């Protein structure tokens, strides 16, 4: 099976970007709650 590097990168970014965004919001919310 050939590994499509571009598809792999696109999928990784598609997962990591929203995850990082939500993580930042979570951290800010916890910091403000304290």
Swiss-Prot record:
Bilayer topology term: Single-pass membrane protein
Short name of one Pfam family: PsbM
GO cellular component: chloroplast thylakoid membrane; photosystem II
Segments passing through the bilayer: 5-25
Biological processes annotated in GO: photosynthesis, light reaction
InterPro entries associated with the record: PSII_PsbM, PSII_PsbM_sf
Domain of life the protein comes from: Eukaryota
UniProt KW Mitochondrion keyword: no
Major location category of this protein: plastid
Location(s) in or outside the cell: Plastid, Chloroplast thylakoid membrane
Keywords attached to this entry: Chloroplast, Membrane, Photosynthesis, Photosystem II, Plastid, Reaction center, Thylakoid, Transmembrane, Transmembrane helix
The protein's role, per its UniProt record: One of the components of the core complex of photosystem II (PSII). PSII is a light-driven water:plastoquinone oxidoreductase that uses light energy to abstract electrons from H(2)O, generating O(2) and a proton gradient subsequently used for ATP formation. It consists of a core antenna complex that captures photons, and an electron transfer chain that converts photonic excitation into a charge separation. This subunit is found at the monomer-monomer interface.
HAMAP family recorded: PSII_PsbM
Subunit structure and binding partners: PSII is composed of 1 copy each of membrane proteins PsbA, PsbB, PsbC, PsbD, PsbE, PsbF, PsbH, PsbI, PsbJ, PsbK, PsbL, PsbM, PsbT, PsbX, PsbY, PsbZ, Psb30/Ycf12, at least 3 peripheral proteins of the oxygen-evolving complex and a large number of cofactors. It forms dimeric complexes.
PANTHER family: PHOTOSYSTEM II REACTION CENTER PROTEIN M
NCBIfam families: PS_II_psbM (TIGR03038)
Family: Belongs to the PsbM family.
Protein name: Photosystem II reaction center protein M
Organism: Citrus sinensis
Encoding gene (name): psbM
């Amino acid at each position: 099976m050939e590994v499509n590097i571009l598809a792999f990168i696109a999928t990784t970014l598609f997962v990591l970007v929203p995850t990082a965004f939500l993580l930042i919001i979570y951290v800010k919310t916890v910091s403000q709650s304290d």
